[in-house]
């Protein structure tokens, strides 16, 4: 997953900052709308960028990547209850609840940082491949997998011993991954326009499938019951794939800069968040038939999200942005810069 910072290409206008837990007017019944905002303050060092959000249903906490730290936020109140700080460049957070351990992919340090889920204190550092990005826990193998965007491989970690037990060549730049809970992991290979299936018990690649007509695969999630993958392409397409055959069943147009897809089993809804400021909501009518429910206008930059299955609320983070600079010879395609101190969580629900 690409971090959101000054290196992202887009056109933005300055949005006025959101205050803590601002209640907003109700939308029509049944439609997703903005319920509140949680102000999360400035990033350490003043440079705003962010990546994955992880929701822990047992503690009802959100783990939010923010520059060189992970902020831990109460999902119901927006209160910041702690942080894991002094990191280099945070990407993702994987939780191994039965061990009460969390694992942070620190891309700037080429390592995974281990912390205690209760005390939030760091307990270890694990060297990985270059720029660990996505990080997930696979319950079938009981291992943690990092997808390393610089070295094009995956580091396999035993969370009981905090050690790397295998390294898997991915054959391209790995992005978002999802585990099916039965021993298969599906990972987007962004620069190859592919999805690979990986046997998590043998640490071997089993299949490589094209995501065409989608390109630059980033976000992915899965309907495990019906074996469907939801793949976000940076060419503004959502591709729905059969996880057993690699067949692309259906596609939908989406906004630019997708970075999160979420499937909710209880409602059969698919949520797709994009950088341009759209939350697309689709429905699985049948395993081979999907439909558009609605497209919710969010805010520019709001492309990293998490879902609370209990309340059906979606949490998306973003910030305000300055104006786009004038093009120069050195920077022919300049990008707007996030404004320090405006980072926030947007909470959407019905």
Segments from the language model and where they lie:
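N-terminal secretory signal peptides that target proteins for export/translocation
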Residues: 1-8
């Amino acid at each position: 997953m690409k971090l959101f910072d000054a290196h992202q290409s887009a056109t933005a206008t300055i949005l006025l900052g959101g205050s803590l837990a601002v209640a907003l007017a109700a939308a029509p019944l049944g439609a997703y709308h903005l319920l509140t905002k949680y102000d999360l303050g400035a990033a350490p060092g003043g440079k705003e960028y962010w990546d994955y959000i992880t929701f822990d249903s047992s503690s009802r906490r959100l783990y939010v990547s923010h520059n060189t730290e992970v902020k831990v936020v109460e999902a119901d109140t927006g209160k910041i209850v702690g942080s894991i700080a002094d990191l280099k460049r945070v990407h993702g957070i994987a939780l191994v609840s039965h061990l009460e351990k969390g694992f942070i992919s620190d891309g700037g340090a080429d390592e995974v940082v281990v912390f205690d889920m209760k005390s939030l204190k760091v307990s270890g550092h694990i060297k990985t491949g270059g720029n660990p990005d996505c990080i997930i826990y696979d319950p079938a193998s009981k291992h943690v997998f990092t997808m390393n965007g610089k070295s094009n491989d995956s580091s396999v970690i035993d969370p009981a011993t905090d050690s790397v037990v295998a390294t898997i060549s991915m054959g391209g730049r790995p992005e978002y991954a999802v585990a099916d809970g039965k021993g298969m992991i599906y990972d987007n290979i962004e620069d190859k326009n592919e999805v690979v299936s990986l046997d998590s018990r043998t640490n071997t690649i089993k299949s490589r499938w094209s995501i065409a007509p989608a390109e630059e695969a980033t976000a992915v999630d899965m309907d495990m019951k019906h074996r469907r993958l939801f793949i976000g392409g940076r060419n503004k397409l959502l591709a729905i794939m059969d996880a057993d055959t690699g067949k692309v069943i259906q596609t939908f147009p989406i906004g630019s800069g997708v970075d999160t897809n979420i499937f909710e089993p209880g409602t059969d809804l698919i949520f797709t968040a994009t950088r341009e400021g759209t939350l697309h909501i689709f429905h699985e009518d049948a395993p081979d038939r999907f439909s558009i429910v609605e497209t919710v206008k969010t805010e520019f930059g709001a492309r990293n999200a998490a879902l609370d299955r209990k309340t059906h609320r979606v949490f998306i983070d973003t910030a305000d942005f300055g104006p786009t600079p004038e093009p120069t010879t050195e920077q022919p395609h300049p990008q707007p810069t996030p404004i320090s101190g405006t980072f926030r969580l947007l909470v959407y629900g019905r």
